[in-house]
Amino acid sequence: WSAVGGLTRNPHDLTRSACGSSSGSGAAVAAFLTPLAIGTETDGSIVCPAGINGVVGFKPTVGLVSRTHIVPISSSQDTAGPMTLTVADAAAVLTIIAGTDRADRATAMAREVQQDYV
């Protein structure tokens, strides 16, 4: 929601919600305004907008992607993840954003499991 533009709508049906706190990201990808977006999720904020807007989005395992500068809600659930038009693009984005961050202790083991997800 924005004070300027109001409620984010599903670009496929403007009478419907875009779903969740990362709805702007999902709607922007679905409307071809951007080829990718990064959503943040505690419980459904990536996967709901992805599903409702017809794009690819998933919640990576906590600790695989840094949470630095993400507003904390739940340290055991918060993470960031990709929203794209294709599975291959989502895998490529995850390959780029996954890794260790000294500012986020949860990512200490990320390099050990990190791989090329494409």
Summary of predicted features, one role per range:
Residues 59-118:
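A short helix-breaking turn/cap at a secondary-structure junction
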Residues 1-80:
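Short glycine/serine-rich loop/turn segments
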